[in-house]
A protein has these predicted regions:
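Mature, function-bearing regions of proteins
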Residues: 1-232
């Protein structure tokens, strides 16, 4: 598999107690963890930006994470959808790994979530659609409760991911990522057209947080983070 780039629109929608919707354009890489592209300054993929030991490889760390949960891919292919480190910076609210067995069948999906406090948490899904309890503090306006409904089909020519949080009080939050793969000829043009894309993701999320705070939404204190085995 060659690395691919998807030009995407990312949407966030909060229903209550304050309604807030925002969208922004960006791009994401889909890469094979055994054949990571190296484009200095414009695209770097480092283990320290993802789950596990920063001294190992991303692939080795993912295999270790899965082994700790009784899963052995037998050397099967793993593809990762993520922002690359660009000009020394990266922020990935969500990184998705599609984990295949040696025969090519899908064994599981891993959804790695990062917050703006440099913490991470990985959710192991049995397939591309699953429901899991929320176990990680992400937004300062939501407690750690509720359940995520994730739909994370592996991309082909198009990309369509969605995550919905349903909370006990009936309030919900939804995020989606939709886009299309760009041609190999347009790959570098896409990167150059969005040189600060990954930094802009972090800035937009923080700015929306400031807006919600100024509108009177109360901040939920951040609980002590309990690192997962093989993640942080």
């Amino acid at each position: 598999m060659k690395a691919s780039i998807y030009e995407v629109t990312i949407s966030h929608a909060r229903s209550a107690p304050l309604r807030n919707v925002f969208r922004y354009r960006s791009y994401l890489w889909l890469v094979d963890l055994d054949h990571l592209p190296r484009v200095p300054w414009l695209a770097r993929f480092r283990a320290r930006d993802h789950l596990g030991d920063p001294r190992a490889t991303i692939r080795a760390n993912l295999d270790r994470f899965l082994a700790g949960r009784g899963i052995d891919l037998g050397g099967g292919r793993v593809t990762m959808l993520a922002h690359a480190r660009v000009l020394g910076y990266v922020f990935n609210p969500l990184t998705v790994y599609w984990c295949h067995r040696a025969d090519g069948s899908l064994a599981c999906v891993v959804a790695e979530v990062h917050n703006t406090y440099r913490q991470r948490h990985a959710y192991l899904l049995p397939g591309v659609r699953a429901e899991v309890p929320k176990d990680f503090y992400v937004s300062p306006f939501y407690p750690v409760d509720g359940r995520y409904r994730m739909s994370l089909p592996e991309p082909d020519a198009s990309l369509a991911l969605s995550v919905r949080l349903d909370r006990p009080d009936g309030h919900s939050f939804a995020a989606s990522v939709r886009g299309r793969a760009v041609s190999s000829r347009a790959l570098f043009a896409t990167v150059l057209r969005h040189p600060w894309s990954t930094a802009a993701v972090s800035l937009r999320i923080r700015w929306q947080g400031v807006r919600l705070y100024l509108r009177g939404l109360p901040v939920i204190p951040r609980p002590a983070h309990q690192p997962q085995q093989g993640v942080q």
